[in-house]
């Protein structure tokens, strides 16, 4: 069965479901790396992507965002010239109660009986003002980091703002 659209899971409608014993198997998140670049270096400028609303971000949107941003910043700064960090983890389990459609579906389908649903993916619960991605760079590569975060935000289901949290005085306009 195909992946449902993200709009089905985007809003936070209720509190997190914590009874994991009912969920048989949780699919692995698609996000492969959470820290990329040079984690041992200290960068004077730090730029963050901040959410403008409360939202659930699916794991495949996070992975897509990571690939887009990391690819750009890697080409601009080189392998050791930046630190790219994803600050959220997809803990929320997304469930789907599959419904049969078509002729004779009423005889096959259970309807709302046993409607708990199967786990189809994971998502990160993000609050308004929470940092999603952080990039650390040298001052001369600030605009490359800003563009990388803009590309990251295009892949996410929420409006985001780019905030300089460290080294604002080092940036030349």
Swiss-Prot record:
InterPro entries per record: Ribosomal_uL16, Ribosomal_uL16_arc, Ribosomal_uL16_CS_euk_arc, Ribosomal_uL16_dom, Ribosomal_uL16_euk_arch, Ribosomal_uL16_sf
Pfam families: Ribosomal_L16
Gene Ontology biological-process entries: translation
One Gene Ontology cellular component: ribosome
Keywords assigned by UniProt, alphabetized: Ribonucleoprotein, Ribosomal protein
Keyword field contains Ribonucleoprotein: yes
Gene3D superfamilies: Ribosomal protein L10e/L16
PROSITE patterns in the cross-refs: RIBOSOMAL_L10E
CDD domains (UniProt xref): Ribosomal_L16_L10e
Transmembrane regions: none
Keyword flag Transmembrane helix: no
GO molecular function: structural constituent of ribosome
Domain of life: Archaea
Similarity comment: Belongs to the universal ribosomal protein uL16 family.
Protein name (record): Large ribosomal subunit protein uL16
């Amino acid at each position: 069965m195909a992946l449902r659209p993200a709009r089905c899971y985007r809003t936070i409608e209720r509190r997190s479901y914590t009874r994991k014993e009912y969920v048989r198997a949780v699919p692995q998140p698609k996000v492969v790396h959470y820290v990329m670049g040079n984690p041992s270096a200290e960068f004077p400028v730090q730029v963050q992507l901040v959410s403008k609303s409360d939202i659930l971000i699916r794991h495949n949107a996070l992975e897509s965002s990571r690939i887009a941003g990391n690819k750009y910043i890697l080409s601009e700064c080189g392998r050791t010239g930046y630190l790219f960090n994803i600050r959220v983890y997809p803990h929320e389990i997304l469930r789907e109660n599959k419904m049969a459609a078509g002729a004779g579906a009423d005889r096959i389908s259970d309807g709302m009986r046993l409607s708990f649903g199967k786990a189809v993916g994971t998502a990160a619960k993000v609050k308004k003002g929470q940092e999603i991605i952080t990039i650390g760079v040298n001052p001369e590569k600030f605009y490359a980091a800003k563009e990388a975060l803009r590309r990251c935000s295009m892949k996410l289901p929420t409006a985001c703002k780019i905030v300089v949290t460290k080294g604002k005085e080092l940036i030349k306009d």
